[in-house]
Regions:
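Polar low-complexity intrinsically disordered regions
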Residues: 1-2, 371
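Conserved helix-loop functional segments at active or binding sites
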Residues: 42, 302, 354-362
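Short, conserved secondary-structure transition motifs
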Residues: 263-271, 372-381
């Protein structure tokens, strides 16, 4: 008989079996469920070496999969981030900001990176730059709000060297006062690159702290019920060097979230070069059950990025997008690499689908099982799209619902 490693008893255990949706106890051996039932039934399998956990009536669910997460990049920075989700007021948020600033050693910054909206606060507003500067006058602060804006305190502006001569980047705006000096407010108009690139200039943690940070991030995901995720890559997440920390944790058997990861093109104009290099270095499926290479994406070419800043008009993708994307998708198809791509608006998605169909029609390369949908089905999808988006863009959709009904 298989040695039982773990028994959970006296609980409310969700099985997802329609015939038997809830049980009291579960027995696990070698990472597999071998028995469910009443506590008395399952405890008959216990051995002197079995770990037995009394749930005392608590709920247990199967592990959740997050199909779109930036877990590898996020783990490298998690210990440096101040989280505002669930914070009830601007006053509380500023108090936490001050505490974090007082405990942040130079040259590190205080970073609030998403996960919140002004409508969660009792005041129903954003913190002001004056309030942020008062809470943290000396430690650099970066506060990201959705993919629409970021606030920098005066200390961060000084470290970055932002002044009246600093130009606005393409698709972004540095808000200025009457003297032309930056106020600290950055706007995506609609490109979020101004936000990403600014945050990317903040100091990184030493490698040993990145390891610790990634472990803490995975532990937090576990607390929320997440046991597996598809990593969508990310800007500034270079392969293979920025995967060293997660590979170290995998080699040391310290991963607590299963990860399938995608490779994200990094530099505009060099995306095809990235994929030509990577397709010679690795292949989808490389790895094991815990850590596996998954394919390309979510960025295949920067010219296809339509962002999701709903404060701004929908951007028109440049005419060169189709040619750039077609060359990349054709290469991926020839190499049998699955891919994913980030897209927000149906106008963009239609153009992307046209590229995929064109690649699929070529005799020398074919996308396996490529199916496209007639406009009738696309219109049906558009009617329920907000329900789909809520899965991976909850805070943004919630914000839209509250703000715009």
């Amino acid at each position: 008989m298989t040695e039982i490693n773990l028994i959970l008893k006296n609980g409310k255990i969700t099985t997802l079996d329609p015939q038997n949706p809830e049980v009291q106890a579960i027995a696990i051996a070698d990472g597999k469920v071998v028995r469910t039932g009443t506590t008395d039934e399952v405890m008959k399998l216990a051995t002197p070496t079995s770990k037995v956990v009394d749930l005392n009536g608590r709920r247990v669910i199967p592990g959740l999969n997050d199909s779109h997460l930036h877990i590898i990049r996020g783990g490298l920075n998690y210990n440096m981030e101040l989280r505002w989700e669930g914070v009830p007021s601007v006053a509380d948020a500023l108090r936490l900001l001050k505490e974090q600033a007082d405990n942040t050693p130079a040259p590190q910054w205080v970073r609030v990176v998403g996960g919140w909206t002004e409508f969660q606060f009792a005041e129903k507003r954003l913190p002001t730059l004056e309030e942020i500067n008062k809470a943290a006058p000396d430690t650099p602060v970066f506060v990201l709000h959705l993919y629409a804006s970021a606030m920098l305190n005066r200390a961060a502006l000084d470290v970055l060297g932002f002044n009246k001569d600093t130009p606005d980047p393409p698709g972004g705006k540095i808000v200025r006062n009457e003297k032309g000096e930056p106020t600290g407010l950055l706007l995506a108009t609609p490109s979020a690159m101004i936000l990403y690139s600014t945050l990317g200039k903040a100091p990184k943690l030493p490698v040993e702290d990145q390891v610790n940070s990634t472990r803490h991030f995975m532990r937090e995901l576990n607390r929320l019920g997440i046991t597996s995720a598809i990593d969508a890559g990310g800007g500034g997440q270079n392969y293979p060097e920025d995967y060293d920390v997660i590979k170290q944790l995998h080699d040391q058997n310290q991963m607590t979230v299963r990860i399938a990861y995608n490779l994200f093109a990094q530099k505009a104009g060099q995306e095809l070069d990235d994929y030509r290099r990577w397709t010679e270095m690795t292949f989808p499926g490389d790895g094991d059950e815990l850590f596996r290479m998954n394919g390309a994406g979510e960025n295949l070419t920067w010219s296809a990025g339509d962002f999701e800043d709903f404060y701004e008009p929908r951007p028109d993708l440049p005419e060169k997008m189709e040619g750039e994307l077609e060359a990349i998708v054709e290469h991926l198809a020839e190499k049998k690499w699955p891919f994913r791509i980030h897209a927000t608006y149906d106008e963009s998605i239609n153009r992307l689908l046209n590229v995929f169909e064109r690649v699929n029609s070529k005799s020398h390369s074919q996308l396996d099982l490529l199916l496209t949908m007639p406009k009738l089905y696309l219109s049906v999808i558009s009617n329920v799209l907000v329900r789909w988006v809520v899965v991976s863009r909850f805070s943004i959709v919630w914000h839209i619902k509250v703000r715009f009904s």
